[in-house]
Curated annotation (Swiss-Prot):
It comes from Thermoanaerobacter pseudethanolicus (strain ATCC 33223 / 39E). It catalyses: pseudouridine(1915) in 23S rRNA + S-adenosyl-L-methionine = N(3)-methylpseudouridine(1915) in 23S rRNA + S-adenosyl-L-homocysteine + H(+). It is found in: Cytoplasm. The gene is rlmH1. GO terms for cellular component: cytoplasm. The lineage of its organism: Bacteria, Bacillati, Bacillota, Clostridia, Thermoanaerobacterales. Belongs to the RNA methyltransferase RlmH family. Its EC number is 2.1.1.177. S-adenosyl-L-methionine binds at residues 76, 108, 127-132. This is Ribosomal RNA large subunit methyltransferase H 1.
Length: 155
């Protein structure tokens, strides 16, 4: 089983990078994970709605170019479905048991995620109604994946 994480922008803080490396090592016995970064558009101050939509579109097109056909796509979005860690592990298990060999998790940039990606995803998933920095979401996702595979949540 293979998991892709497609994320907008590069990690800038060492503590986040260190955490990502930590969880990638812990996940290695359970699955293959590849993180694909796409370029983040620079957003000017006092962005108009039209400018925001254009930035989301450009980032979104880059994301779409990285999604492999046949992969089960999960977009992380604040308005998505909320589930707990146990249900997340059951969801991962059920997805792979249903015949999918790959899952792709998509994390948008600082402005969020292009609406077209959310519409094309199999699932829009929310980890919380709170807003988290998009770079930190990679670490949070990896931690939840580790919990799912580690057996504490019965995967």
């Amino acid at each position: 089983m293979k998991i892709y994480i497609i994320a907008v922008g590069k990690i800038k803080e060492n503590y986040i990078s260190d955490g990502i490396v930590f969880y990638l090592k812990k996940l290695r016995p359970y699955c293959e994970i590849e993180i694909k970064e796409v370029e983040e558009e620079k957003a000017p101050q006092n962005l108009s709605e039209k400018e925001k939509e254009e930035i989301l579109r450009k980032e979104g097109e880059r994301i779409l170019s990285k999604i492999k056909k046949g992969s089960f796509v999960v977009s992380l979005a604040i308005e998505g479905k909320e589930i707990d860690s146990y249900k997340f592990s059951q969801f991962i298990k059920a997805t792979f048991q249903s015949g999918y060999r790959e899952m792709t998790f998509v994390i948008g940039g600082s402005l969020g995620l292009w609406e077209n990606i959310k519409k094309q995803s199999h699932l829009n998933l929310s980890f919380s109604k709170m807003t988290f920095p998009h770079q930190l979401m990679r670490l949070i996702l990896l931690e939840q994946l580790y919990l799912a595979f580690d057996g504490k949540n019965h995967l």
